[in-house]
Amino acid sequence: MVFRIASSPYTHNQRQTSRIMLLVLLAAVPGIAAQLWFFGWGTLVQILLASVSALLAEALVLKLRKQSVAATLKDNSALLTGLLLAVSIPPLAPWWMVVLGTVFAVIIAKQLYGGLGQNPFNPAMIGYVVLLISFPVQMTSWLPPHEIAVNIPGFIDAIQVIFSGHTASGGDMNTLRLGIDGISQATPLDTFKTSVRAGHSVEQIMQYPIYSGILAGAGWQWVNLAWLAGGVWLLWQKAIRWHIPLSFLVTLTLCATLGWLFSPETLAAPQIHLLSGATMLGAFFILTDPVTASTTNRGRLIFGALAGLLVWLIRSFGGYPDGVAFAVLLANITVPLIDYYTRPRVYGHRKG
């Protein structure tokens, strides 16, 4: 009897790329819901614009490359890229910004390298950074959370602001950004950095309405906890591994704690770092991208720790208030080096 030895792999599972991407999309529902609750309908409009733009851009490039459009679009990677970019930008940013960022992310940051699996950088973060550098004012014009906002735009107003820049009653972004204290609001991280540079004490800064939350910034703490809930669900579904989120959050916490202990008058407390900005979104949904992250367990720990350190450095000493996108891209650069030095030893191989 002749036995045939099949080629590897010898273990199989049902985790196709499309299913993993779908799980990530489903896990994003709590975070999206929280952003809708605290920042209004603009987030939903941005998601729809980004999704359509991502699918059309991907289809166009695939058509030009004479590849199967339907089969590739079914992997859901274009949708995920659009979603991650849409939830990262201000909810009432002009419509052309999310379209431009999404098209750039899909065509330049993904398809130009050969498509899914070939891109060295996270496409959504490339699109975000391009927008942030090109249009810094619009990209930092976040609305105050509803609990401290004076003017809360409805669904129709959100659409009108996104497409025309004004509400039906003639209000603009300057009006919508007013908080209950009559001052234009920014994110907790942006407010802290700007106020410290203006010479305000931390005690004064913590009295601002934006810090009226139980743990950190108003609204933002719940948004981050919602993204955390989605991330925990991804871990439970085994769609991502624990190494990157854990090392990222532990490193960020340690750096923020040490910095705050040594310089409490100039550096933010650890809970502000953990529950403000894109911390949890980055930890569970962006850094864990299987294409652009490290592929070994030790490498994942190093990769996550490096990103956590970079986020704290950029937030504390850099020119941008958040820093997650820049940290992700800088960490992406190091992945080949990290993977090279953390390769597991081949079974049976002895050290020379």
From Swiss-Prot:
Source domain of life: Bacteria
Major localization listed first in the record, in broad terms: membrane
EC number: 7.-.-.-
GO BP annotations listed: electron transport chain; transmembrane transport
TM segment ranges: 20-40, 42-62, 78-109, 123-143, 148-168, 214-234, 242-262, 267-287, 301-321, 322-342
Keywords: Cell inner membrane, Cell membrane, Electron transport, Flavoprotein, FMN, Membrane, Phosphoprotein, Translocase, Transmembrane, Transmembrane helix, Transport
The keyword Translocase appears for this protein: yes
InterPro entries: NqrB/RnfD, RnfD_bac
Membrane topology category: Multi-pass membrane protein
Subunit structure: The complex is composed of six subunits: RsxA, RsxB, RsxC, RsxD, RsxE and RsxG.
Name of the protein in question: Ion-translocating oxidoreductase complex subunit D
Organism: Escherichia coli O139:H28 (strain E24377A / ETEC)
Gene from which the chain derives: rsxD
